[in-house]
Amino acid sequence: MGIRNYRPMTPGTRQASVSDFTEITKSKPEKSLTTNRHDQKGRNNRGVITSRHRGGGHKKLYRIIDFKRNKQNIPARVAAIEYDPNRNARIALLFYTDGEKRYILAPAGLQVGMTVIAGEEAPFEIGNTLPLSRIPLGSEIHNVELVAGRGGQMVRSAGAFAQVVAKEGDYVTIKLPSKEVRMVRKECVATLGRVSNAEFRNLKLGKAGRKRHLGRRPHVRGSVMNPCDHPHGGGEGRAPIGRSGPVSPWGKPALGAKTRNKKKRSSALIVRRRTK
């Protein structure tokens, strides 16, 4: 992927940049692997806002991604690298030798015509999926399972990768992109390589309209609201928040307060907590 910077012809294009999409080989998605998905707009089943600043944006078809990679020992040819509007990584269309088609997250370096496979005896190559117990120390991996058979839940965003740092007993220790070090069962699977589209982090939207196009609404500061809308609101002019520390709209400590439940069972598997 490359980044194309706009010339400063207008205020909106002055700082804007876009992907050049040179790695994309197919423009329309595989119809059998897409589905309509109702846009929640940040609401739950009762219509109550549970995730603020969401709504609008362009309509999208959801691409059904194979995060489980449970088609064991059957080779698949990479037929295309595609754009997915639902995530910042690219996706790869696979044609299996038995005729089935599936989408997977495209690792960096995966190209059309290459062959990938999942299984315990899969070769050590980019795009192949193996149990963590079979992956050498120091290897870069992504799409990592937390529970065997549930499918990859960690390390799925553009450019992300984890590293295998140790193996002991029934657990494999991995270092996550957040610098957290945690143990995972050795039966859990992961895919070799790092996720594609690593330069996504360098894109600049340039104007608010592109953010709205992505389905993100304005993030309004609490200090400019009324006191009925936010604990930071009210006062004459630019008043201080009037509390010992910043809080959320519902009065909970914000901006740095630890929110993880101390009684979580998985805390025993975290060797080193993530850094800020």
Swiss-Prot record:
The keyword Nucleus does not apply. Residues 12-22 have a biased composition (Polar residues). It comes from the Bacteria. SUPFAM superfamilies: Nucleic acid-binding proteins, Translation proteins SH3-like domain. Keywords: Ribonucleoprotein, Ribosomal protein, RNA-binding, rRNA-binding. GO terms for cellular component: large ribosomal subunit. Signal peptide: none annotated. InterPro entries: NA-bd_OB-fold, Rib_uL2_dom2, Ribosomal_uL2, Ribosomal_uL2_bac/org-type, Ribosomal_uL2_C, Ribosomal_uL2_CS, Ribosomal_uL2_dom3, Ribosomal_uL2_RNA-bd_dom. Pfam families: Ribosomal_L2, Ribosomal_L2_C. SMART domains: Ribosomal_L2, Ribosomal_L2_C. Residues 23-42 have a biased composition (Basic and acidic residues). GO terms for molecular function: RNA binding; rRNA binding; structural constituent of ribosome; transferase activity. One of its GO terms (biological process) is translation. The keyword rRNA-binding applies. Residues 210-220, 259-276 have a biased composition (Basic residues). Belongs to the universal ribosomal protein uL2 family. Part of the 50S ribosomal subunit. Forms a bridge to the 30S subunit in the 70S ribosome. This is Large ribosomal subunit protein uL2. It comes from Synechocystis sp. (strain ATCC 27184 / PCC 6803 / Kazusa). The gene is rplB.
